[in-house]
Amino acid sequence: VAGILVFAKTPAAAKDLNKQLQNQGFGKYYRALVTNAPSEKEGTLEDYMVKDARTNTSRICSAKENGAKIARLHYDTVPDHGRLFSTVSGSSSSVDVSLSSQSQECHETELEIHLDTGRHHQIRVQLASIGCPIVGDTKYNPELTGNKRWQTIRLCAYKLDFKHPVTHKAMHFQLEADPA
């Protein structure tokens, strides 16, 4: 996981930033390189999730399950010319890659994700649940367990929007696309 982080310099600034986070005042945008393309080029995923602190995992569950919290994200497919990630082969376009001993072919697709909620491992769990696990995610993609082909998970917090905690000026930070 890579990307942009925000740190507060003072306790008052931290309090304001936390308040913005809780009231959905933060625009949190991620890029993920996933195996397989979602059935729709853009969409909203809304599920209930529960965290298992013992195993440091989360899973989708029913709304009635003890500890269940709503999890909502929006995704959009990124065109090849706007990619942040290079594909596994180093190409800037989608490629087919073999992920398992059965040589199951998967198609890499880059998604832009906007979080409405920020649950533990939310993006990883929800994308895996629709058959689009993140490249390099050995926790939620059993096809990759023990596979060392990718060194890191291809998930990046690439854009943040929020109001400055003192001046209330709109702040916008964004990583540039991979020039390769």
What residue spans do the PLM features occupy?
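RNA pseudouridine synthases
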Residues: 1-180
